[in-house]
Amino acid sequence: MRAERWSQTVRQIRSPRALRVIPLTALMLISGCGEKEQVSSATPPPDVGVYTVRAQALTLTTDLPGRTSAFRVAEVRPQVSGILQKRSFVEGAEVKLGQQLYQIDPRTYEAQLRRAEANRTSAQNLARRYETLLKTKAVSKQQYDDALAAWKQAEADYQVARIDVQYTRVLSPISGRIGRSTVTEGALVTNGQAQSLATVTQLDPIYVDVTQPITKLLGLQKALESGRLQKTGENQAEVSLTLDDGSAYPLPGTLKFSEVSVDPTTGSVTLRAEFPNPNRKLLPGMFVHALLKEGVQNAAILVPQQAISRDTRGVPSVWVVKADNTVESREIQTLRTVGNAWLISNGVTEGERIITEGVQRVRSGIAVNAVEAKNVNLVDGFAATTEASAN
């Protein structure tokens, strides 16, 4: 039975009708594959947004934390002893150089001054009389010299007594803002006491002390020496200030000096800037951020942050659209962030196009349809003063 069925099947396959159907089916399959290949080859290149790289002069700055310190600080102390009779200032007010702050009881010192004045007059008269007698040799030269020395000593005692009387009027040693008084009327104060009577602080101008890692300072010096950076000017470096609440201080300052030694515990060097402070907005001890101009890079290239990707090793790269509209991945070397972009040292050149939109749709070697990117807005990219924070 099985042998008969098999023979019947073979006869059907070998029949002319079956032989005509098989080539037709194969032809339809081949035709279908060709249509799929034509559809695939007709797929348009993906759209990508590109940013055209440009080079331009860029002023580089560095943001350093710091604290304000007073331009001058003077502790008011008594130079004579006595009972404090009067306080002549309002706590927290502005005082001038030489303005009277306190009055110490002067009566004892005025009496000593009168006694010193009498002794001076007596010594002066004796010396002049001996001078006359010396001409007639009524007194010896030694007696005259002793009288003359006594006169000079009496004169010195008089001057000391006069100064002590002046010291009973305690004056402000500098101009500035005076703090609270640590003593009241009726208190006994002494010359050389440890506690000051008050403190006067000069707030205009005011210092800002910032610290910079020595490695960054050395790198800046090398960049200036090599010519990669140009000095911003021949005068003192300009510094701008940001307060702790994020607001900008309106008046610029100047960098005065850097410390001559490095802190061995932190590896940092202290820089001091001076700021005008006419409205007394800055007070000693405030935490601030100082923005220091480092120099000008004449052919700086900025790359938007969204154009940069990193591999598993952390190496940054960008997708570059070549002249034939094909793309390639290219490694770059980043230096620092500038606003919302990266300053790079190599990898791409001016005029090249890098992809910032549609990165996920590209692979190396494919053709793309490059249009101007809409997601690029380099904040403060090439402004005259660019806020750059060192890595």
From Swiss-Prot:
Chief location of this protein within or outside the cell: membrane
SUPFAM superfamilies: HlyD-like secretion proteins
NCBIfam families per the UniProt record, alphabetical: RND_mfp (TIGR01730)
Subcellular location: Cell inner membrane
Family according to the record: Belongs to the membrane fusion protein (MFP) (TC 8.A.1) family.
Highest taxon of source: Bacteria
GO BP terms: response to antibiotic
Gene3D superfamilies, per database record: 2.40.30.170, 2.40.420.20, 2.40.50.100, Helix hairpin bin
Key words, A-Z: Cell inner membrane, Cell membrane, Coiled coil, Lipoprotein, Membrane, Palmitate, Plasmid, Signal, Transport
Entry protein name: Toluene efflux pump periplasmic linker protein TtgG
Signal peptide feature range: 1-32
Pfam families to which the protein is assigned, alphabetical: CusB_dom_1 (PF00529), HlyD_D23 (PF16576)
Gene Ontology cellular component annotations, sorted alphabetically: plasma membrane
Function: The periplasmic linker component of an organic solvent efflux pump. Involved in export of a number of organic solvents, including toluene and styrene. This is the most important solvent efflux pump in this strain, although it can export AMP and some antibiotics.
Covalent lipid adducts (S-diacylglycerol cysteine), residues: C33
Molecular function as annotated in GO: transmembrane transporter activity
Induction of expression: Constitutively expressed; the ttgGHI operon is further induced about 4-fold by toluene and styrene but not by antibiotics.
Lipid bilayer topology: Lipid-anchor
Coiled coil: 107-136
